A protein has these predicted regions:
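Mature catalytic domains of secreted/periplasmic carbohydrate-active enzymes
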Residues: 1-318, 324-339, 350-362, 367-369, ...
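Short hydrophobic/aromatic segments of transmembrane alpha-helices and their interfaces
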Residues: 187, 216-217, 390-391, 401, ...
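Bulky hydrophobic/aromatic "packing anchor" residues in well-ordered structure
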Residues: 195, 385-388, 404, 533
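Short, solvent-exposed loop/turn elements at domain surfaces
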Residues: 204-206, 393-399, 534-536
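Aromatic, loop-rich ligand-recognition surfaces of beta-strand-rich domains
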Residues: 248-258, 263-379, 395-463, 473-532, ...
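Surface-exposed loop and turn segments in beta-propeller and other repeat-based domains
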Residues: 466-468
Length: 542
C-alpha cells in the first residue's frame, strides 16, 4: 500500500488536479511517477497493490468548500483507480483537519464508495470503508476478544452516527460483538480488524530514528497480538530520502521473516488439520510428536461459516496429569496462544462456549524461540529533571517529569505547564508524551512552546504548533527546533485538546538542550545524552 497523497496534499503521481505533485519536482525532470513505479514492481514480484489517499488536504484551495472539494478528491481517486491496473486495496483514514483556508471539509463518503465499487469492484476498502476496520490504536496491539462479526456500523454509511451512538460504540470500543450488544443491534456487519503500526517510532522517515527501528522481539510481540488476535497486520516501512528502505529496516524485516518461517514451518500436532464441528462444552484431544518442546498453539475457524467461538480452554498432558496451558475468548480466522514451554504427550482443546456449532478448520502446535529486546532505549530529553522547580503550588505536576509514562498529570482547563530548569540552557527541542491508558482526555493537540530567562518575559519558539495524528497515535511526540533558544524557564501552553475538551494531561515532558559551560558556582552541565527512560516490549510507548 503506497501513500499516494498524505495530509500535505503532495501527489506522488502526475495528477491533472494540481501542480502540487511530482510534476513540480526536479526528480526525473518532473516526468516521474512513483505510483506507477511501485505498481510495476508489484506486478513484477507478484505482490498485491493498494493505495492510500488522504481525504484531508492542507494544500488544496477548495478544501472546506463542500462539493467543490469532493469533486476534486473523487477526480484524484478516479485517476488512481483507472490508470494503474488492478488495485487490490483502497485505504482512507478519517483525518479531518483544517485546510489552508482554515475550514474543515464534510466528505461525501457514499459517493467515494460508489466510485470505488464502479471502477475497482474487487478492491478491499479499509478503515473509512466497509470491508476492513481500524483496530483503534497505532501501537500494534489488537483486542484479546476480537469479533469480525460486529455491531459497528461502517463510518461511510450515513446511518452510522445514529446507530453507533444508540449502541454506545465507536472504533475504539472494547466490546463490538458480545451477545448482549448483538441482541440490541439493528444490523450486524462482517467487518474484520486491521492493526496498523510503524516499524519506527513515527510513520515517516527521519534519520534520527535510524537506531530506533523496532526490535525483533517487539515485532514478534506485535505479530502475536495482531495476527494472533484475529486481525490483519499492516506494518508501515517508510522509505528514506533516496527512495529506498533503509538498511536497518531491511535487516529487521529479513530477521522478522526468518523468525516467522522458523516458528511455523514445523507443526508438532498430529492430525491438526482435521475439521471439527464443536458445540459448547465439547473437547478434542490431539497427539503430540514425541519429545516435542512447544509453547504456541494455533486455532482457526472456518470463517466462511461465520465466527462462533466465544471461549476456550487449552490443556496439556504429561506425567499422567492434565495441566491448564491457557484460556482464551474469540478465535475467528486465527488465534495464536502463547504458554510456558513444555513437552506434552497430548493436547486437549475444549470449546467452553460457542454460538451454535463452531467450525474448527485447523489447529497447530509450534515452538516460538524466546526473544530478548535489545533495542535502543528511548530518550525523552537530556536535561536532568533533578534541578527542575515548578511554577505554582500544584505538586501533582511532578507526575509530568517523574520518568514514568504510566503516571499522568491531569487538570481541568487548558492549563499552562511552566518549569524552572534550575540554570540557563540552550534549548533545542522537547518531547511530549500523552497518557498511555484508555483515558486520552486532556491530550494536547495544538500548543505554543515558550522560553524565558527570568520567568516574566517570554519568547515563542518556532514550531508547527500541533501534535499531528496524536488522537489516533498517542505516542511520544518529539519537537526539534531549527535553532536553539536560550532560557532558564520553559512553558508548554495548550491551545486545543484533541476533542475540544477544557482539560489538560501530560504523562511525561522532556527537554533537549546543548550543554553549557558550568559557572563558578556550578559543577553540573547537561549531559548529552542523559539517562534515558527504559521501555520494555509490551509497554504502550513505542
Amino acid at each position: 500500500v503506497i501513500t499516494a497523497k498524505h495530509h500535505d496534499g503532495f501527489c506522488l503521481w502526475p495528477t491533472k488536479t494540481t501542480r502540487h505533485s511530482v510534476v513540480s519536482s526536479p526528480w526525473k525532470n518532473g516526468k516521474g511517477d512513483v505510483v506507477r513505479e511501485l505498481r510495476n514492481a508489484c506486478k513484477k514480484y507478484g505482490l498485491k497493490f493498494g493505495i492510500y489517499l488522504s481525504p484531508w488536504d492542507r494544500n488544496a484551495e477548495c478544501y472546506g468548500q463542500g462539493d467543490a472539494y469532493n469533486r476534486f478528491f473523487i477526480e484524484q481517486l478516479t485517476e488512481l483507480l483507472t490508470n494503474y491496473g488492478e488495485v487490490h486495496e483502497v485505504w482512507f483514514d478519517g483525518a479531518n483537519g483544517e485546510g489552508p483556508n482554515g475550514k474543515k471539509q464534510i466528505y461525501d463518503w457514499e459517493a467515494i464508495e460508489r466510485t470505488i465499487r464502479r471502477l475497482q469492484p474487487k478492491a478491499v476498502t479499509a478503515v473509512m470503508g466497509d470491508d476492513v476496520r481500524w483496530v483503534g490504536n497505532e501501537k500494534g496491539i489488537g483486542r484479546k476478544t476480537e469479533w469480525s462479526a460486529t455491531v459497528l456500523t461502517p463510518g461511510i454509511y450515513s446511518r452510522a452516527i445514529g446507530q453507533n451512538k444508540e449502541l454506545g460504540v465507536f472504533g475504539k470500543s472494547k466490546d463490538l460483538g458480545s451477545r448482549d450488544i448483538v441482541a440490541r443491534a439493528k444490523e450486524l456487519f462482517w467487518f474484520p480488524s486491521e492493526v496498523d503500526v510503524s516499524i519506527r517510532p513515527g510513520w515517516f522517515y527521519h534519520s534520527k530514528e535510524d537506531s530506533h527501528v523496532k526490535s525483533l522481539a517487539h515485532l514478534a510481540d506485535i505479530y502475536f497480538k495482531s495476527v494472533g488476535y484475529n486481525s490483519v497486520l499492516l506494518l508501515n516501512i517508510p522509505p528514506d530520502k533516496s527512495g529506498l528502505i533503509h538498511e536497518n529496516d531491511c535487516r529487521r524485516l529479513k530477521e522478522f521473516s526468518t523468525y516467522l518461517k522458523n516458528t511455523f514451518e514445523k507443526d508438532y500436532l498430529k492430525r491438526g488439520r482435521t475439521r471439527w464441528e464443536a458445540l459448547s462444552g465439547t473437547s478434542k484431544e490431539y497427539m503430540v510428536r514425541k519429545d516435542a518442546l512447544v509453547n504456541t498453539f494455533m486455532i482457526q475457524e472456518d470463517i466462511t461459516k461465520g465466527q462462533r467461538v466465544e471461549s476456550f480452554l487449552l490443556e496439556g498432558y504429561w506425567d499422567g496429569n492434565w495441566r491448564t496451558l491457557a484460556e482464551g475468548t474469540t478465535v475467528g480466522y486465527k488465534r495464536l496462544v502463547r504458554f510456558t514451554e513444555c513437552q506434552p504427550e497430548k493436547i486437549r482443546l475444549t470449546i467452553r462456549s460457542a454460538r451454535n456449532a463452531a467450525h474448527i478448520l485447523r489447529t497447530g502446535l509450534f515452538y516460538a524461540r524466546p526473544l530478548t529486546d535489545n533495542s535502543a532505549k528511548v530518550q525523552l530529553g537530556n536535561v536532568p529533571v533533578s534541578q527542575w522547580r515548578l511554577s505554582g503550588t500544584d505538586e501533582t505536576m511532578r507526575k509530568a517529569f517523574d520518568k514514568n509514562v504510566q503516571t499522568v498529570w491531569r487538570t481541568e482547563g487548558l492549563k499552562t505547564f511552566t518549569v524552572d530548569l534550575g540554570r540557563d540552557a540552550e534549548i533545542t527541542g522537547f518531547s511530549y508524551t500523552p497518557a498511555q491508558d484508555d483515558n486520552l482526555a486532556g491530550t494536547i493537540y495544538k500548543y505554543r512552546f515558550e522560553v524565558s530567562m527570568d520567568g516574566s518575559h517570554w519568547k515563542t519558539c518556532a514550531t508547527s504548533g500541533e501534535f499531528s495524528n496524536i488522537m489516533h497515535n498517542p505516542v511520544t511526540c518529539f519537537v526539534h527546533f531549527e535553532q536553539s533558544y536560550r532560557g532558564r524557564f520553559f512553558r508548554l501552553v495548550p491551545l486545543a485538546e484533541i476533542s475540544g475538551k477544557p482539560c489538560t494531561s501530560i504523562a511525561e515532558i522532556g527537554i533537549f538542550a546543548v550543554a553549557l559551560p558550568a559557572k563558578d558556582d556550578e559543577s553540573a552541565v547537561y549531559p548529552v545524552p542523559g539517562a534515558p527512560l527504559t521501555l520494555k516490549v509490551g509497554d504502550a510507548h513505542p
